[in-house]
Amino acid sequence: MQKSLITKWLCISCIMVIATIVIGGITRLTGSGLSIVEWRPVTGILPPFSFESWQAEFAKYKAFPEYNSVNYGITLSQFKFIYLLEFIHRLLGRITALIYIVPLIYFYFKDVIKNRDMLPYIIALWLFCVQGFMGWYMVKSGLLNSPYVSHCRLAFHLIIAVIIYHILFYQLIKNRCDILLIPSQTDLKLPLIFSGIAITVVYVQIFLGALVAGLDAGLIYNSFPLMDYSFIPMEIKDNFFDLKNWYDPVFIQFIHRLGGYSVFLVVVVLIICLLKIEHPKLNKIAYFLMIALLMQVSTGIITLLYSVPIIIASIHQLFAVILLSIIIWCCFLIKSS
């Protein structure tokens, strides 16, 4: 009974984190992230209701750079749209934190989760707190002189969310999945190594994807596989190792492409390793990996070719998390065998 409760709690928490990540991506893609110019963790749980309160929020927004530089002249109705998207993202974050924290306190005092097992849950709790501050720290970067948030802060904001999800999902499968029974003579060293490498390259690629989103780097060089008839664009050939390139949309898109190739190659090798073992469950994971990889690659290419359509770009982000989840599951099963 207790194990079932923890499983349901972790499952709901994971779903909520994914939903918050996806809505956060949509918020960025629609340029809605700077519409709420204050951080009110408690009193900000309710949106404006009256016409006067909407006018007051709109007046606050007009005092900041984004209105004057990017959205000058937008109507109140247009402002409501971007405001509500950012509001939903913040509200989801608060609800997700509560869904995680309140049951965690209950489980701890009822001794449902033992002291020896608490460390990952405490780390996730700490990261939830950090994430709230990181979200505002990111937004604040676009409320000063520039009407754009720092792409680096955006990337760290996303990565913290993914790490939280990773911890919760790992605890979920640890609580839910049975140990994999494989003959002792089976060599699992190679698939274990490549599952670890795959997790690493997917993390790096998610981080790079956030940099692309933060710099609107998906709106340039909308061709594939070449960038304006060249594998390496002319703008970065002569100064490829210059640290300033990390603020250059051309360089960031190029590195994200390289990351995509790396993810594809590593996951394909992992799939081959899993299929060679000829174990039903690992073979099933291999097929899931094929589907997730195909979806991730195809949505990434379509996102680029069609200048970042919001729905496809959001699906692309979602499948990055799904792909990571399958690899984590794979790694857990191999380690547990």
Swiss-Prot record:
Its main location: membrane. Pathway: Porphyrin-containing compound metabolism; heme A biosynthesis; heme A from heme O: step 1/1. It comes from the Bacteria. GO terms for molecular function: metal ion binding; oxidoreductase activity, acting on NAD(P)H, heme protein as acceptor. It is an enzyme of class 1 (oxidoreductase). It holds the Pfam family COX15-CtaA. The keyword Transmembrane applies. Interacts with CtaB. This is Heme A synthase. The gene is ctaA.
